[in-house]
Amino acid sequence: MKLQLLIAGQLPSCLETRDIWQSACHQQGVELEIIELEDAQGQQLIDTLGIKSFPVLLADGKIKVVGRPDPQRAANIIKQLLIS
């Protein structure tokens, strides 16, 4: 499974969300790719998926979560993604 987190630059809320997802992924031994919306790859994802809110967690190119979860919810989401 390929996990990507699309964030809006250095906004504090995006950085906090990045840290939450990185920790949840690290606990499960899953790699997380961080993509900034300003990058070419970020712009392509925005256009392709019609993303309008950030941050966004993608699993295998599909939107799974929008916004900032609490750490426990993030951990539960990663566990669910791994068993599905």
Language-model features, listed with the residues they occupy:
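Secondary-structure boundary motif
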Residues: 23-27, 48, 83
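Short, flexible active-site loop motifs that bind/organize anionic cofactors or intermediates
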Residues: 4, 36, 64
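Structural micro-motif
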Residues: 49-57
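Local sequence-structure signature of Cys/Sec-based thiol-disulfide redox active-site neighborhoods
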Residues: 1-27
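Generic recognition of short, well-ordered alpha-helical segments
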Residues: 15-19, 44, 69
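Non-catalytic, surface beta->alpha helical segment in thiol-disulfide oxidoreductase systems
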Residues: 59-84
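Thiol-based oxidoreductase modules, predominantly thioredoxin-like and allied folds used
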Residues: 7-9, 30-42
